[in-house]
Amino acid sequence: MTRKIPGIIPLEPYCREMVWGGRRLAELYDKELPTDVSIGETFELSAYEGRESRAAVGPLSGCSLQDLVEEYRADLVGAEVWSRYGGRFPLLIKLLDAQQNLSIQVHPDDAYAQLKGLQDAGKMEAWYVLHSDGGRVAYGLEDGVGREDFSAAVTNNRVAEVIRFYTVERGDLVFSPPGTVHALCAGVVIYEVQQSSDLTFRIYDYDRPGLDGKPRELHIEQALEVIDFSQQLPGPVPCPDLRGQVLVESEHFVLHGCGLESDSAEHAAEGSFLALTLVGGRAVIRDGEGEYALGTGATALVTAGGVCEIAPLGDEKLEYLVVAVPT
């Protein structure tokens, strides 16, 4: 017999060691990280195989998100989301700690992934900068750079000369549709929401070894096939004051930024589940069945049809991001 589905499921992340990672997520957000390794990513909301987040508390504690998707199906994700994606949970939320530059890379779209018979979907993503030590992001190409120019830059080891770099601060938003050449650079910590996919075509990786001591694979041919050379990107958008506005509205996810100094706010998961991630302050989140305390950097899932109330804990302003699948 299926267990009763909770309205709110606080989540425990999967931690992933990366050659470019560090320990800032423990320092900034008190994350419990594996000892003596450089953690680059925490998968806060993830049903991606081998990197699943898990229910943190309550009767479902320890259950992976994928297990919960398989058990509750449309009751968890929403009827329209289930009809569109089936058992494949569509979104993934991470926190990333870049203590070194990430590889310069590009992601394909769904059509390319299907055309090539790839297992994963395409990958659209958005970043919200949580912390920056004067760090930068690589984002888009310089004006007039075409396929031949880019290919020549790769061949001559001059990729950085044809890419735009921006210094970022907390509150900056970066939206990367498929086909965008991009990279997170050293000294930046971000929140990332993306399609649940690991399709990444590396273009340049600084000639460094991976965790196994060997150079990581590059994917130049595939990258040239999927880069959108016609893109005109605005650069990072400052969004330091979260007050309930839509930050990103796309075919795969809608991202809101919210802020509270007192009182409380209510969020209804209409048509799709919601995922709430605290990016400043502490909160209590509740519905008619339970109440949970969340610290900065924590994520909770509100199941489809559920309604939650969120309120600040303490005097610090509460800031949080809310994401859903458009229906």
Task: List where the protein language model places each region.
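C-terminal amphipathic alpha-helical segment
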Residues: F201-F273
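Short beta-strand segments in beta-sandwich/barrel cores
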Residues: G135, S264-A265, G281-R286
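His/acidic/aromatic-lined binding-pocket segments of jelly-roll/cupin-type domains
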Residues: I93-K94, L102, Q119, E125-Y128, ...
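Short, structured beta-strand/loop micro-motifs enriched in basic residues and often containing a Trp
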Residues: A152-V159, R282-V284
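Transition-metal
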Residues: M1-V145, D205-Q231, L255, T327
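An exposed, glycine/acidic-rich loop-and-rim segment of catalytic or binding clefts
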Residues: N156-V162, L173-F175, V181-Q232
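Ligand-binding loop in jelly-roll beta-barrel domains
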Residues: G86-R88, L96-N101, A111, S132-G134, ...
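Short acidic-glycine-tyrosine-enriched beta hairpin
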Residues: I163-F175, G288-G306
